[in-house]
Amino acid sequence: MSQHHGTDTIAAVATPLGQGGVGIIRLSGPRSHAILTALFDSTSPGFSGFRPRVLHHGHIHDGTPQRRILDDVLAVHMPAPRTFTGEDVVEINCHGGPAILAAVLDAVLRQGARPAAHGEFTRRAFLNGRMDLTQAEAVAEMIAAPAAEGVRLAQARLDGMLGRHINALRERLELVRVQLCVAVDFPEDEVECLAPADFMHAVEETADAIRKLIGNYERARCWREGAQVVLAGQVNAGKSSLLNALLGRKRAIVTDVPGTTRDFLEESITLDGLAVRLVDTAGLRETGDIVEQEGVRMSRDLAAQADLVLLVVDSRLGTGPHEQELMAAMEAGSVLVVLNKTDAATEDELDRCVRSLAGRPHVAVSAREGKGMDSLAAAVREMVLRRSNALTADAAASDMAPNLRQTEALRRALEELEALAADIVSGVPYDLAGVRLESACSVLSEITGETTPDDILNRIFDSFCIGK
């Protein structure tokens, strides 16, 4: 990819807003080094200028004739092209107070830099050929990953594995297209061309590889996005107590008054490396209260959309008609029964409750005493992964799971190849077949950014935070 060094210099705070030990101001562009030199006073005797990629200690001043010191900093200059963006880059490590960072950034901007747009540093890295588009997207996904396994998934794409695989598929189709063009343009010459059987084999083999990538998207979804787990059950079964126990803090109001939870509460946690969105819902019961009726209706809707339902049952009372109705309406493997309040149940009550489940998966806990939480977490993880036919975390990283945009493009490419295979069988002329091959190659190029339209690039990079 050709170089597209920016003609201007951009700057932004590269660390999260708020108080912290260290905050970083990042600059990229042709004036980065000059701006740093204008604002920096070294504390090292005999300082003669910035050595590339070496941290230097000193003071940043405000750029006025008075040279008022703004902060005590560590600064580094990284010359192009071996930088993240492919341009001259400067990073100023300040103390992490918002007022300090704002003052230093203001001084930088007054020296001629402009504020960076969302994702502009990574966009410049892409435009300057430092990474392909799949790697650029992986940067944002690593930052947004809800758990460690999601980071691993994004890291595999940041390493360029997916982009290289897509390019290999596209290059194979390009080779086939070239051979078709030769056959069309020089029909009377004795040139080596693909036999129809070889042509079909190349198309089908590439289509199979694309199908696998598409399947990997859904099978890696729980690692990338996390799972939605809904807590449902009768009023006073202990759903809110269970939510609090899983979170390790009091989030939901717990009382003996039926119908305390009318709306739903949502919190995120990590269970055995799996990011989970826990949703506590209104208790299932018949009620004349209009607000509570809406809460019960919403509970059923949320349960139907969940990756897993934790059906919380008072182990002293067992399952009633509402619980039985919910279990009957749900798909097999989508409900884990949580037998709660085991600290207050007799052995006979607990045995009777287990028998009523007719072999359905269940875990016995006491939310009030915090007992059984580890077993519950393990069961949730196992059932979510089994139900979604999820790749293992290792396989999700090594098998190159694409994101949604990439998967949609892969589906379009696959449609072209499947139509092409049908054309081959029906004897469509090679020149028409070449049009479909060209279309499939073009779509694959969009994935890596070789031919991606500007509106798609804008959508991708606008989703980044400023400073990245």
Swiss-Prot record:
PROSITE patterns: G_TRME. GO terms for molecular function: GTP binding; GTPase activity; metal ion binding. GTP binds at residues 236-241, 255-261, 280-283, 366-368. Its cofactor is K(+). Its EC number is 3.6.-.-. It comes from the Bacteria. K(+) binds at residues 236, 255, 257, 260. One of its GO terms (cellular component) is cytosol. It is found in: Cytoplasm. One of its GO terms (biological process) is tRNA wobble uridine modification. Keywords: Cytoplasm, GTP-binding, Hydrolase, Magnesium, Metal-binding, Nucleotide-binding, Potassium, tRNA processing. InterPro entries: G_TrmE (IPR031168), GTP-bd (IPR006073), GTP-bd_TrmE_N (IPR018948), GTPase_MnmE (IPR004520), MnmE_dom2 (IPR027368), MnmE_helical (IPR025867), P-loop_NTPase (IPR027417), Small_GTP-bd (IPR005225). Mg(2+) binds at residues 240, 261. Binds 1 potassium ion per subunit. Exhibits a very high intrinsic GTPase hydrolysis rate. Involved in the addition of a carboxymethylaminomethyl (cmnm) group at the wobble position (U34) of certain tRNAs, forming tRNA-cmnm(5)s(2)U34. Belongs to the TRAFAC class TrmE-Era-EngA-EngB-Septin-like GTPase superfamily. TrmE GTPase family. Homodimer. Heterotetramer of two MnmE and two MnmG subunits. PANTHER family: TRNA MODIFICATION GTPASE GTPBP3 (PTHR42714), TRNA MODIFICATION GTPASE GTPBP3, MITOCHONDRIAL (PTHR42714:SF2). This is tRNA modification GTPase MnmE. It comes from Oleidesulfovibrio alaskensis (strain ATCC BAA-1058 / DSM 17464 / G20) (Desulfovibrio alaskensis). The gene is mnmE.
